[in-house]
């Protein structure tokens, strides 16, 4: 289950009430915290907080975004993830080769961090700074309708496995699969599942 993050909502909102945007973000965080608690009470197994604006506005994210995010996760005992991305692939085609805000999430209360690596060809060395977190590695390029082979997907994951333990890696698509034709999306997901099976066999016993 996903919920919008407090920092991202504060960046999209018009603030006519709070003295500072930081105050606004913290009140959003309190509301998100209640929502997360309700979702777990209703039976959710994982709740993901989407924070794309941390990549878009890293200075403000450092100033008060991480504080707001941690407030949203305060006291939560269920498994939580934070998603940070470059925007939908169908809309934003040019991707930077690295995140402007990512190592900072080592200080986040979440259990998992969801990132994109396929379209951006991310240098996965940055993941070494996130040890202790499970990483959802975006490994499906959603700007290209070509269906990757399982081996292509597996090789993208191997780049992350240079810096992470196998048990800390979760395979996922990059951001924005909803724009793909259903048959293309289905084919890409099947390749991702096949890549996961391939990698499990390859890394069995390496923990």
Which residues are covered by each model-predicted region?
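Domain-level signal for soluble alpha/beta catalytic cores
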Residues: 1-207
């Amino acid at each position: 289950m996903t919920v919008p993050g407090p920092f991202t909502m504060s960046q999209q909102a018009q603030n006519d009430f709070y003295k500072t945007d930081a105050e606004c973000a913290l009140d959003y965080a309190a509301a998100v915290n209640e929502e997360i608690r309700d979702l777990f009470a209703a039976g959710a197994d994982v709740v993901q907080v989407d924070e794309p604006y941390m990549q878009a506005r890293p200075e403000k994210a450092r100033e008060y975004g991480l504080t707001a995010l941690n407030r949203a996760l305060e006291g939560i005992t269920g498994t939580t993830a934070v998603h940070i991305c470059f925007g939908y692939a169908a809309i934003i085609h040019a991707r930077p080769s690295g995140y402007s805000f990512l190592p900072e999430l080592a200080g986040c209360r979440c259990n998992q961090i969801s990132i994109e690596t396929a379209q951006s060809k991310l240098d996965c060395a940055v993941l070494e700074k996130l040890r202790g977190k499970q990483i959802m590695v975006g490994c499906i390029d959603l700007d290209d309708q070509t269906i990757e082979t399982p081996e292509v997907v597996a090789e993208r994951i191997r780049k992350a496995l240079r810096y992470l333990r196998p048990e800390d890696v979760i395979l996922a698509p990059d951001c924005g699969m909803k724009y793909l034709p259903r048959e293309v999306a289905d084919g890409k997901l099947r390749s991702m599942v096949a890549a996961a099976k391939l990698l499990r066999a390859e890394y069995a016993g390496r923990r």
